[in-house]
């Protein structure tokens, strides 16, 4: 009805309801009506002479006539209780969006608070610095007495809050929990450096708050959430204010930057409550949440709240500070008497030089010594000797503990790292540029990644905690964000759809409805929870909590900072990357197996890198299980590249990467390699830098070398050019470097005009996709080592890979099938012969008990320890196994060695499991009935279900007669017996489904039969037509065109068919007789 007033509860402090038209405008975000004057009994001091707190900066716009105030004409206001998406499963907008919106609204400052953390602090600070918005930092603390919002007064307040949160998280003993002390102890830690916001929920404890924190540090928080209960809360808080004299502020407590995001905020809150939106309705805001409002909007909605608005600015002026914390330094190294860190590092390098270079030519040794002198000078000038000593200590710990490790990445460009034993790529003969790793012109510490065998990485991590202390060392976080499937699942869950339907959508069996798609799109990319970085650790000379809180990680014994690697770098925390690498673990197992069974000691770093047999094998794309070159794309490239030297492997590692593929380097290089295209250079000066890659740029270091050779750049200048050309290009820096490059070309070689333009444009284009040669060098060593074992010791190679699972591109079933194709006899799982893991006795492959699903490591260990066994009751009693254990072993065929069939073994399991230690043996025996044996297919199906593998045959072997009748061609004939361009039918077990971003929508299917692997290309159109079959089938018959002219085989599919396994293997059914 026209003119009717609707009691929204938005009556401010007058008790008079606002008209619905104004409420509608406020809720929609429209500015309605003329701003009403804000009445003050006296001019608030904060609007004229702000009083900065410790470490604070003046709040922009807090004075009358400031630029922001003039621009917007708004009432000065600061939102002091905002929540971003880094308050996991609560806020809907990221810190940057919150900052941008606050700036647009004319707010003079903003406070972002996370629950029991400072997760978004760095991103908040960086976003605010870009727009000149003052920042207030704080957190919501889950105290025993209730949730309390704390704002920091300057840097010291921040440091104290970080320590409080750290103590609460670490004392709780597990991830996701906090255990704060009682309120008086909390206040004691703040020591007057915090402002606490008390809402109506603190009304009965307000005197206790004042007693603990002091009257000047307690502020009443009046809600402005446009809820009916707001008015009642205002009345209560005004009464408390009258009695106590406390200051008050107004806050919308926003969980989103704008109204557009509040539905997402509501959905996330429902998920946090483990409910859907309907179930959580009583706990959620009717709109889903609240959003940032301007001072003017709040003044219109709450016309007599002027004192509350003014107080927000006053408090911000005493709390805001710029986030330029002084980060802790690295621990000082305990050097022997008479040594500094630098002299001790020099001593270590000199003492280990001969070990690394004794066998090198004299000319290389002299160049290496000169390079090392240069590198040590740079390290000393930049003040990083302690960094290298810490890394060296970690590597020496690994060596002493016989843990395989090696440094990789840009550290491989350093001769110092090579001599110390940190890296294994020799940079002098490889021509690697040290400045790619470290230079006088670069800010920040070097970055050394250490790959450690994955099964023993935890030992190294715990060594760091022990050596440097839990307070001074922690892992770097990884913010886990929603990806497509996770977003779809949680969106559907929030909207109340049943789990079975959600599972079908996730599998792609059907399309989700529009509301799910829309909400999932909003969730995608949003932070969900805090995880652990793959290997980053920060190590400091004082508590990390001075800068960022730490908390327990999910994994036992791990603690983690609340920031990711980028946040840590921005705050000046030095990160060390300790990365787990499955291939190093597999190689260690291979070495141990060869030593144990053959009595041969293999020293990886002494292997001959020119073994012709290894390269012959790789030229055939016989690379299943070989590090980095076993993927579909790599195996398709190997026959075209035809690697014959170690550097060819370096190229192979770098070639099949998204960058070179998108940059168009792959095919030109391969054509030049095969002689189909002449090797040319845009200018003769490029031959030095591009000669080893046939005139095609592949490596980042080549950009630097071109700048050095063609334009006379120093190494440091060349690295600055490389970084400037990276993903975050600065137009200003690019312009300056372009001018320097052109001048250098002219001065050094007289290159001008079109040739200069061509060189510059090629470098700019290449910079976006170049791969570090140092990285390729490090990985190429592991390519060779793993290929060497595959060629010389295939049984030990496969056993090592199985022991290191999960890792690599292929499943254990595919690895075992590949070993079988290489002549290795596969021995089944046996309680009397198998160990916990795979073994390689006498050149055979014995499968391990760890493959048995549902058995568990402890039970497997007991079985192996007490073997052999004479019967199932004997096994049950001595290995202390239950019914489920014996049933799992029976299905896996591990009891076949006792002379009982699998069905009989399953029958005996329940009875035998009553034989426990301390009981008389044999009294529980019951005769099993006569049970039929299993067919070959039933045995295979049972083995796959129980272990995921088959020891005696690949599944397609049982179907070969049927496949031959259909004209299906085996994998091993596609290269030798089928002409390029022939239409064929193939069939196999689906091993992979891939859709690389570089493939223009083409999906690649991996198929395997008993003779080998096949690569199938499915066009977007065919995929769409047969989507359900393509996505869900475990076996397929595929019709398509063979492509094998280059020596690598692909099949371009034009039809997918289900493989009728059940029909072919059925014994017939008895229907309705």
From Swiss-Prot:
One of its GO terms (biological process) is DNA replication. It comes from the Bacteria. One of its GO terms (cellular component) is cytoplasm. InterPro entries: DNA_pol3_alpha_NTPase_dom, DNA_pol3_finger, DnaE2, DnaE2/DnaE/PolC, DNAPol_HHH, NA-bd_OB_tRNA, PHP_dom, Pol/His_phosphatase_N. Residues 60-73 have a biased composition (Basic and acidic residues). The lineage of its organism: Bacteria, Bacillati, Actinomycetota, Actinomycetes, Mycobacteriales. Transmembrane segments: none annotated. It is found in: Cytoplasm. The gene is dnaE2. Pfam families: DNA_pol3_alpha, DNA_pol3_finger, HHH_6, PHP, tRNA_anti-codon. Its main location: cytoplasm. Gene3D superfamilies: 1.10.150.870, Metal-dependent hydrolases (3.20.20.140). SUPFAM superfamilies: PHP domain-like. This is Error-prone DNA polymerase. Keywords: Cytoplasm, DNA damage, DNA repair, DNA replication, DNA-directed DNA polymerase, Nucleotidyltransferase, Transferase. It catalyses: DNA(n) + a 2'-deoxyribonucleoside 5'-triphosphate = DNA(n+1) + diphosphate. Belongs to the DNA polymerase type-C family. DnaE2 subfamily. Its EC number is 2.7.7.7. Residues 41-73 are annotated as: Disordered. DNA polymerase involved in damage-induced mutagenesis and translesion synthesis (TLS). It is not the major replicative DNA polymerase. One of its GO terms (molecular function) is 3'-5' exonuclease activity. Coiled coil: none annotated. It is an enzyme of class 2 (transferase).
């Amino acid at each position: 009805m026209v003119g009717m007033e609707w009691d929204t509860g938005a009556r401010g402090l007058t008790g008079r309801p606002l008209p619905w038209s104004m409420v509608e405008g406020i809720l929609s975000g429209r500015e309605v009506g003329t701003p009403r004057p804000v009445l003050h009994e006296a001019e608030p001091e904060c609007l004229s002479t702000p009083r900065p707190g410790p470490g604070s900066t003046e709040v922009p716009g807090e004075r009358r006539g400031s630029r922001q105030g003039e621009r917007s004409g708004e009432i000065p206001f600061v939102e002091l209780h905002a929540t971003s998406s880094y308050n996991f499963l609560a806020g809907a907008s990221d810190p940057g969006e919150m900052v941008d919106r606050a700036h647009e609204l004319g707010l003079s400052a903003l406070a972002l608070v996370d629950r029991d953390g400072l997760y978004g602090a760095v991103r908040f600070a960086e976003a605010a610095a870009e727009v000149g918005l003052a920042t207030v930092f704080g957190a919501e603390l889950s105290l025993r007495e209730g949730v309390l919002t704390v704002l920091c007064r300057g840097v010291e307040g921040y440091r104290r809050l970080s320590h409080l949160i750290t103590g609460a998280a670490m004392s709780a003993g597990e991830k996701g929990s906090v255990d704060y002390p009682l309120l008086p102890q909390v206040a004691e830690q703040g020591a007057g450096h915090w402002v606490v916001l008390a809402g109506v929920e603190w009304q009965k404890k307000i005197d206790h708050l004042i007693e603990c924190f002091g009257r000047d540090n307690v502020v009443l928080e009046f809600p402005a959430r446009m809820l009916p209960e707001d008015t009642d809360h205002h009345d209560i808080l005004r009464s408390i204010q009258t009695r106590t004299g406390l200051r008050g502020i107004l806050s919308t407590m926003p969980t989103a930057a704008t109204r557009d995001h509040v539905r997402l905020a509501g959905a996330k809150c429902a998920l946090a409550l483990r409910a859907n939106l309907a179930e959580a309705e009583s706990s959620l805001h009717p709109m889903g949440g609240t959003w940032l409002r301007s001072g003017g909007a709040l003044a219109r909605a709450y016309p007599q709240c002027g004192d509350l608005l003014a107080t927000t600015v006053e408090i911000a002026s005493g709390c805001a500070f710029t986030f330029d914390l002084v980060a802790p330094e690295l621990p000082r190294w305990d050097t022997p008497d008479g040594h500094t860190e630098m002299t001790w590092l020099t001593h270590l390098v000199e003492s280990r030089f001969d070990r690394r270079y004794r066998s090198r030519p004299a000319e290389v040794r002299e160049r290496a010594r000169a390079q090392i002198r240069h590198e040590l000078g740079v390290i000393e000038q930049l003040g990083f000797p302690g960094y290298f000593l810490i890394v060296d200590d970690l590597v020496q710990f690994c060596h002493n503990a016989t843990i395989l490790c090696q440094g990789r990445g840009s550290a491989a460009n350093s001769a110092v790292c090579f001599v110390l034993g940190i890296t294994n790529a020799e940079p002098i003969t490889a021509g690697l540029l040290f400045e790619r790793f470290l230079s006088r012109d670069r800010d920040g510490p070097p970055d050394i990644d250490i790959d450690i065998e994955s099964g023993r990485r935890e030992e190294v991590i715990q060594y760091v905690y022990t050596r440097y202390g839990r307070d001074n060392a922690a892992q770097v976080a990884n913010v886990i964000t929603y990806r497509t499937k996770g977003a779809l699942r949680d969106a559907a869950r929030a909207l109340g759809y049943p789990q079975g339907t959600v599972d079908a959508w996730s599998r792609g069996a059907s399309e989700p409805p529009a509301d799910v798609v829309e909400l999932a799109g909003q969730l995608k990319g949003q932070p969900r929870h805090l995880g652990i970085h793959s290997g980053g650790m920060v190590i400091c000379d004082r508590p990390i909590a001075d800068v960022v809180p730490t908390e327990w990680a999910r994994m036992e014994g791990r603690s983690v900072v609340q920031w990711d690697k980028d946040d840590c770098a921005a705050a000046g925390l030095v990160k060390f990357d300790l990365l787990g690498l499955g291939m190093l673990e597999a190689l260690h197992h291979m070495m141990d197996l060869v030593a144990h069974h053959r009595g041969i000691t293999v020293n990886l770093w002494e292997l001959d890198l020119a073994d012709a047999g290894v390269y012959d094998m790789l030229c055939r794309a016989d690379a299943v299980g070989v590090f980095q070159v076993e993927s579909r794309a790599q195996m398709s490239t190997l026959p075209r590249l035809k690697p014959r030297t170690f550097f060819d492997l370096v190229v192979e590692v770098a070639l099949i990467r998204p960058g070179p593929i998108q940059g168009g380097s792959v095919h030109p290089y391969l054509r030049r390699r095969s002689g189909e295209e002449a090797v040319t250079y845009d200018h003769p000066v490029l031959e030095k830098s591009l000669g080893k890659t046939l005139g095609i740029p592949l490596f980042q270091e080549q950009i630097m070398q071109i700048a050095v050779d063609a334009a006379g750049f120093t190494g440091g200048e060349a690295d600055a050019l490389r970084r400037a050309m990276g993903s975050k290009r600065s137009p200003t820096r690019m312009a300056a470097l372009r001018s320097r490059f052109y001048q250098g070309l002219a001065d050094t070689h007289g290159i001008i005009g079109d040739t200069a333009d061509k060189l510059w444009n090629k470098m700019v284009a290449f910079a976006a996709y170049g791969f570090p040669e140092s990285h390729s060098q490090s990985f190429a060593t592991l390519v060779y080592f793993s290929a060497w074992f595959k060629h010389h010791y295939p049984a030990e190679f496969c056993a090592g890979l199985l022991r290191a699972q999960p890792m690599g591109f292929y499943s254990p079933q595919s690895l075992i099938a590949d070993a079988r194709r290489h002549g290795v006899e596969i021995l089944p799982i046996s309680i009397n012969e198998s160990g916990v893991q795979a073994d390689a006795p006498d050149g055979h492959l014995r499968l391990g008990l760890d493959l048995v699903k549902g058995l568990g490591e402890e039970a497997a260990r007991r079985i192996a320890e007490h073997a052999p066994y004479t019967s199932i009751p004997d096994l049950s009693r001595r290995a202390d196994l239950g019914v489920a254990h014996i049933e799992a072993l029976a299905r896996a065929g591990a009891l076949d060695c006792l002379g009982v069939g699998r069905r009989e073994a399953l029958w005996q399991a329940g009875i035998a499991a009553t034989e426990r230690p301390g009981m008389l043996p044999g009294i529980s025996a019951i005769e099993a009935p006569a049970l039929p044996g299993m067919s070959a297919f039933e045995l295979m199906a049972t083995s796959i279900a129980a272990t995921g593998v088959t020891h005696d045959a690949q599944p397609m072997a049982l179907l070969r007669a049927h496949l031959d009748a259909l004209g299906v061609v085996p994998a091993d004939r596609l290269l030798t017996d089928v002409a390029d361009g022939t239409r064929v039918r193939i069939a196999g077990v689906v091993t992979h489904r891939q859709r690389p971003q570089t493939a223009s929508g083409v999906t690649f299917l991996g198929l395997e039969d008993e003779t080998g692997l096949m690569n199938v290309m499915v066009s977007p159109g065919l995929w769409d037509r047969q989507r359900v079959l393509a996505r869900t089938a475990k076996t397929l018959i595929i019709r398509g065109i063979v492509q094998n002219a280059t020596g690598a085989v692909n099949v371009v599919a034009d039809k997918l068919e289900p493989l009728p396994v059940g029909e072919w293997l059925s014994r017939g059914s008895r229907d309705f007789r």
